[in-house]
Amino acid sequence: MKPDFAQYGFAHQENLIMACIGGSQAHGAKLGATDDTDWYALYIPPPTKLLGLEREEHFVFTTGGQPGGNGPLDVDVCLYTLMKWAGLAAKGNPSALHFLFAPLEFTSTTWDQFSARPELFLAKGHVKPFLGFADDQMKRLLGEKGQKNVHRAELEHKHGYDTKYAMHVIRLYGEAKELMEHGRITLPRPNRDELVEIRKGKYSLSEIRDLGSQLESEALAAQATSPLPDEVDRDAISQLLADSHLRFWSQSRN
């Protein structure tokens, strides 16, 4: 069923081509009723909004933003144009690649053409963005980068470190390894029980660092023998994008 994003001010409800739930729920690491809901979706804007002077790339909205942080009833919405998403996915952006493998809440014949060909967007070099994001989360976990997340201060007080950052570190390393070995990302994650345990603080910081280091090494080793191509076929992606947009616009009233 197509989610109603018009209620949040989205102007192109009829142009949606797919939607999925992201965040901790997609990974299988949601803690009961404590997390908000993260919606991700793609749309093809009208020609004037993609080819004209006022070009659109995304739409974001949140019902949260309160001092105490998002609660279980809050919703975060992040919608990308198909063109913007494809550019991110072709570069190996982890969040963008998730769209190809996440359980769908809504799909279309347009998106089916992309989800049926995930290999177009996969390459050996994509291990780098995953490890880069994991390293970023580790530095934030250790206080070496950025400011502390004031909304998660309770986690640090209770466990001695931000366990959500720790969960993302291990998740990203594991996804990088699976992507290199098998050309896919399983969602929810096969080790979701482990990820939940990490969020609950069942692992020490030292154990997180050791596990992260091990998984990073395994991901790099998997890259060396990966069956994936060295680079994505940008011409094939561009052709698929052009065909999909022209077909969608020819059938659309927008």
Segments predicted by a language model, with ranges:
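An N-terminal structural lobe/cap that precedes and organizes the functional/catalytic core
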Residues: 1-106
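Intrinsically disordered, low-complexity regions
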Residues: 13, 152, 192-195
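Short, surface-exposed, charged/polar-biased interaction segments
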Residues: 40, 58-61, 103-106, 110, ...
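Generic secondary-structure boundary/loop-capping signal
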Residues: 47-50, 56, 158, 182-184, ...
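A generic alpha-helix propensity feature with a strong bias for hydrophobic helices
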Residues: 48, 97, 121, 230-232
